[in-house]
């Protein structure tokens, strides 16, 4: 077994039957992190207890205990998740030394299944970004081309997974933050139905949109990880009590008779020719496998980006008001003169510690929620959001799964769009509507640009229909033009 490219279940099975120890696996990936992370900047910190955690897994197996589905599997965790005893910064200076006293539910469930936490992964500050250029920890580089972005906000997770610094990673998706970097880095990323995975212990950006999901190397690995982290959590009132299906066991590449919807609004002239060709190839593949392709229309997605930025910024302006330097996190220093009043203390702390993009969105959100504009902006955005969801529900009466591009183009160069917020926001043009409607969505690698950059296909399903989506992805994965290809940095 080649540990570097082994699947989650292969590693777990080998650890469980003691053909390799969890400690050996951990040391193997720690060496990879040591060698490659300086080039990528994917990890912000390492878990000093990783080897001891692996030894504990080995000891439990030696005692005949059932360690779990992911015994000894090394995982990287996005900075957005609280991890007991490990710094959790959300990519921001304002939380630079924050160490949570507890684990996020998703992390706790992964630990219960036997994983070894290798460390924390870089991200855009408070998940606000599409390129991983807003992080307090610096820019993450795409392992396929070190001059390009890995996508965002879960860029560290995508880069670490694509370069196999770990066997699996965890990300969050508020408007495409799992799917877009997954596409840019050629991995599988899944955003489940809103409420499928607990948000407890995830640093809040936009509470009605945030969702956690796996960023891994295969559809089966994604299904397996999703099984572990999903399910009702009394700590999060938005989680569903629906039973968690055995997605990984029910995976099948048989799409014969399935109706695949092709989103009319997304097949525009704005698509890069390589992306257009990849979508067309995926459609042809599914036709050959027996699926029926039908055109579907969700006209209100034309307003998805402005609606998303109104809703997300408004919720962020409320959520981020808790960071004031009083109880935890960064606090402004007043060496020569103390703060005149509490307001100055707050403004100095936040002014010094929040990045430019976070400040921009807080200002936008505060403006949208102000008394004179609440109805015109926030309320109106909520009404359009409802229409988007209703139109999606109508579309799913005609098809099982909707297929579309993830982004208009492959990964762009570092610095290319950072000074143009509008161009950066339009990266989310195909992904935000899924979050607004609370639907499950994913990116599966399928093609490459002429310059060798990976291109993913986005699949979206009805609420709690992850199995259909995963099955179509499994079929596409089997016929993928990039299967078995890896970044040169490896």
UniProtKB/Swiss-Prot annotation:
GO terms for biological process: translation. It comes from the Bacteria. It holds the Pfam family Amidase. It is an enzyme of class 6 (ligase). The keyword Transcription regulation does not apply. The active site is at 78 (charge relay system), 153 (charge relay system), 177 (acyl-ester intermediate). Keywords: ATP-binding, Ligase, Nucleotide-binding, Protein biosynthesis. SUPFAM superfamilies: Amidase signature (AS) enzymes. Its EC number is 6.3.5.7. Heterotrimer of A, B and C subunits. HAMAP family: GatA. Belongs to the amidase family. GatA subfamily. This is Glutamyl-tRNA(Gln) amidotransferase subunit A. It comes from Bdellovibrio bacteriovorus (strain ATCC 15356 / DSM 50701 / NCIMB 9529 / HD100). The lineage of its organism: Bacteria, Pseudomonadati, Bdellovibrionota, Bdellovibrionia, Bdellovibrionales. The gene is gatA.
